[in-house]
Amino acid sequence: MLVFYALLFVSVFSSTVMGATIDKPILREAIEEIDVNKRAKNPYCKEENCPPGKHCPKVPIACVYGPCCF
């Protein structure tokens, strides 16, 4: 019985390790895509969204509603 569990563990562990080494480029691309999407949906105040005469504060603040210009 112990031998069965040992073989099961080795087979699962080796497939997990091999799967991780094969999928590294795919995971790297997915992580980069997530980072790009986060930058595109940046919640901080953007100067180009402010109406004329108003500006973003010097300290970056996250905007929940609207462009948050002062």
From Swiss-Prot:
Gene Ontology cellular-component annotations: extracellular region
Alphabetical UniProt keywords: Cleavage on pair of basic residues, Disulfide bond, Ion channel impairing toxin, Neurotoxin, Potassium channel impairing toxin, Secreted, Signal, Toxin, Voltage-gated potassium channel impairing toxin
Chain residues in the propeptide: 20-39
GO molecular function, one term: potassium channel regulator activity
Subcellular location, principal: secreted
Signal sequence extent: 1-19
Top-level taxonomic group: Eukaryota
Post-translational modification comment from the UniProt entry: Contains 3 disulfide bonds.
Residue ranges crossing the lipid bilayer per the database entry: none
Location(s), subcellular: Secreted
Expression by tissue: Expressed by the venom gland.
Function description: Inhibits voltage-gated potassium channels.
Family: Belongs to the scoloptoxin-07 family.
Name listed for the protein in its UniProt record: Kappa-scoloptoxin(07)-Ssm2b
Protein species of origin: Scolopendra mutilans
